[in-house]
Amino acid sequence: RSIKLDKFSISDYKLDFGLQYTYKLNKKNTINVGAVYTLGHTLHGDAYKYHQTGTESNGSIYVQSQTGDTIPNPFKMPHTFGAGLTYVYDNRLTIGVDYTLQKWNTADLTWSKFNKESVEMNNRTKIAFGAEFVPSYISHNYLKRIRYRMGAYYSTPYNKVSYTDPDTGATSFQDGAREYGVSVGFGLPMFQSKSMLNISGQYIKVSPKFKGLMEENYLR
């Protein structure tokens, strides 16, 4: 009989920095440019690993061996960089694009090394696009004050998975599943109120690059 226990205790902080610049082309056209950075750092805390083996007889457990180890600061978060561009026309049409890069290939894998696990990581990238249109936010016609929204994104995986080629039997690390998503939504202004009811739907597809991984599709 074997018992394994992994326990983590993390207490840490997160620092985000950002800059934004707005340039007004003319009365109706505006461009916004922004950049963000999240500090990558080692998470403060401990991981505890416990393993016990024994035998069971007549309802009693007899311990044969037990080991326990504490690993300080076992995880590290990646540096994250982001940039975005937004175009606004007459406060009615907004179009934006964002790019994000997470430097997972420099993250510390102390916990995996301790477990003698072979792990490889990728830098994760994500590109997102979105748009919102309101025909007239001051119109008396309710339909013209509805905000119509749509968006899409594509992201690469940060993890690599162990893959065995079914033809050759060779084992190697390959990129994990890519992810795609599209969404649509509406912002419905409430009568006699400044509040708004937001309704949206999203389709997500998780697509592996090779056979052996499950393809996933979500609607939410």
Regions found by a protein language model. Give the residues of each.
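Outer-membrane beta-barrel porins/channels
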Residues: 1-220
